[in-house]
Amino acid sequence: MLSRLARVQPKCQQLAHFSTSKSAAAAPTVKLWIDGQAVESKTTDFVELTNPATNEVIAMVPNATQAEMQAAVDSAKNAFNTWKNTSPLTRQQCMFKLQALIKRDMKKLAESITIEQGKTLPDAEGDVSRGLQVVEHACSVPSLMMGETLPNVSRDMDTHSYRIPLGVTAGICPFNFPAMIPLWMFPVALATGNTMVIKPSEQDPGAAQLLVELAKEAGVPDGCVNIIHGQHSAVNFICDNPDIKAISFVGGDAAGKHIYERGAKNGKRVQSNMGAKNHGVIMADANKEQTLNQLTAAAFGAAGQRCMALTTAVLVGEARAWLPELVEKAKNLKVNAGWKPDTDIGPLISKQSKARVLRLIESAKKEGAQVPLDGSNITVPGFENGNFVGPTILAGVKPNMTCYREEIFGPVLVVMEAENLNEAIEIINNNPYGNGTAIFTSNGATARKFTNEVDVGQIGINVPIPVPLPMFSFTGSRGSFLGDLNFYGKAGIQFYTQWKTVTQYWNESLTELKPQMSFPQLK
């Protein structure tokens, strides 16, 4: 695989994993996936797909036409009529096969992610693996879908409630986890009897394309999962289409709020995971070496392009003296193309992302922050045109600074200081986001106080990125989430299903002689 990846530089012209055809510009065009088939879009409006390490155009992504998007929904709607009545055991078997196929094609999926998104190959495999765990959880759907029964609620009367699928659902995915986020969505939706239309990010759609092909190979019927491509018009189509009953979204604040408001206004169920500013509180009694290693990895891994990246370190008390050692660890990280051996940090997804990160670093300098490590001007030999920013540490940051108020989404660690734990908790709770946080300490009482008082949805105790395994739910809160049912776990099953309750009365000798006009009193 590494030899194949070596051949992508600098032009990245072989993307055999795509269903593609050659456009006039000689770049392959990414196809739609409708009714179990790769479909060439008839649009004349395309978006360039570039390799972030080189900025070479490797494919053209269509902005699908309204007719093509409607065809995807119609396909999902037709498939739902049969799929909803398919035995949960049959759907379970599809999930068993899908997880085996994903394992088989792990390296192929990771290669696609590295070429399109930029993250390192080991990190790309981690992207796939964490999504795979959701597929494995979906394999237990017969148990997860079990309902509730109470016999003899009244004389000769029984009541039972059970979960039924919603219908056609939609998933709108971000660029930063091209495999994991689609796998948060469509396996749970399909396992519970729904069908789905997926809109992957136009910046890296290849992994999603591969995954739906694997779903077909696993026995998922045609039409149960479809892919459309596009930008704003595709998002609004999903929000407005009356046949789509629920929307799952992961991405930025502006899009997340728009999708939640527009989708909810149209009567849809919406779960919207948005921005974050995740704090790591460093206590002086923590294991210094382990803590600094964990903090470095959580801040700079995936070039900081994770919604659960630990972007803000709060050094408490004597731990403030640890900053020079943290800087030294970050200095030793290797920045290079994601397919290069021993790379720690790959490129940012786009030129626009790099420009935003550089703007926020510059704002920190102007607003009085210290910059003990500045990766703004890094040059990667052989990849001078890539979207690279080196590891950067901004120290002495105050809550009113732009670099703290805005989500940076790059390899930049903001460092703040606190006199004590109470002050650190106050900093976190005053921030509008509530996705994740962590504390590093060897004191159980400190950890317990932090857990009880911090207002954040996901907390790590000596765990830098506390993303729960899928038997639990991803529980970001406050400004990081809109909706009332989170992703995967029990909440995920609830999101993609609704209750139906049946009350039945059977009596061999009915004795009612006249209508009972008062409201029934069950005894």
UniProtKB/Swiss-Prot annotation:
Could you confirm whether the keyword Mitochondrion appears in this record?
Answer: yes
Which top EC class is named for this enzyme in its record?
oxidoreductase
- Listed EC numbers: 1.2.1.27
| Sites where the protein binds NAD(+) | 175, 199, 202, 407
Q: Which residues form the active site?
A: 307
What is the protein's known function? Probable malonate and methylmalonate semialdehyde dehydrogenase involved in the catabolism of valine, thymine, and compounds catabolized by way of beta-alanine, including uracil and cytidine.
- In Swiss-Prot or TrEMBL terms, this protein is called Probable methylmalonate-semialdehyde/malonate-semialdehyde dehydrogenase [acylating], mitochondrial
**Gene assigned in the entry:** alh-8
